[in-house]
A protein has these predicted regions:
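Non-ligating segments of multi-cofactor redox enzymes
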Residues: 1-238
Length: 238
């Protein structure tokens, strides 16, 4: 088990990303002193890989039905006793995800939901030549499709691989935390449909928000902290 922990923290597990347990004080520099500052939590041990979140996102945000276009997706990680790591994206199917066969060579298997990390210091915003990618005052990175020229600079700059070029509009697209919903005090579609409450959304500046409670009660990881993008998607139970 010590070897597994070392493997996870070393950065080889989650999509090549670097994982790090962060103390509570590390979050203080992200949020402005006033106003809302949105973030997201994922409880890995609660995710069952049902893909309801993915389906809800595609419907809510008119994401292309082709399997390689996602605003959010779920990956299955299988860590074997010999150190081999197998990563597969769970496909969206009406019948759900089939049960994994019993394999005594497997040390650990789990699901990891992925989405835009809504970085506090987003590289995608910095590289956009026309200002189409921007950050709202409440910390959500959006794309103005009317001004996006489809140059793909932001897609290349994103270290988390969460952006894609929409095949119809030919503009950059990605997760927005369902900004049209949260602006009306509704939850993101993926959070609303999750049957196990594995996804948590909230205001980082509110001590009473579900996300604040999630961070207080769990050891938190973020993806690729060494890049200093200050991601605002926090993972527990990795």
């Amino acid at each position: 088990m010590k070897d597994l922990l070392a493997f996870l923290v070393s950065g080889c597990a989650i999509g090549g990303g670097i994982l790090k347990i962060l103390p509570a004080k590390a979050f203080a520099k992200e949020a402005p002193r006033t106003g809302k500052w949105y973030g997201f939590g994922v409880s890995v041990d609660k995710c069952i890989g049902c893909n309801r979140c993915v389906e809800a996102c595609k419907i809510e945000n008119d994401v292309p039905r082709e399997p390689f276009y996602f605003r959010t997706w779920v990956e299955r990680y299988v860590i074997k006793k010999d150190g081999e790591v197998i990563v597969k994206t769970i496909e969206t199917k009406p019948e759900g995800v089939p049960e994994a066969a019993v394999d005594r060579s497997i040390l650990r298997s789990f699901f990891v939901p992925k989405l835009c990390n809504q970085c506090a210091d987003p590289p995608c915003v910095q590289v956009c030549p026309v200002g189409a990618t921007f950050q709202t005052p409440d910390g959500v990175v959006l794309v103005n499709a009317k001004t996006c020229v489809g140059c793909r600079y932001c897609i290349q700059a994103c270290p988390y691989g969460v952006r894609y070029l929409h095949p119809q509009t030919r503009t950059a697209d990605k997760c927005t935390f369902c900004y049209h919903r949260i602006s009306q005090n509704l939850l993101p579609a993926c959070v609303e449909v999750c049957p196990t409450q594995a996804r948590i959304f909230g205001d980082l500046n509110s001590a009473a928000s579900p996300l604040a409670r999630f961070r207080r009660m769990n050891k938190i990881h973020v993806l690729k902290p060494g890049l200093n993008t200050e991601p605002k998607v926090y993972y527990a139970s990795l």
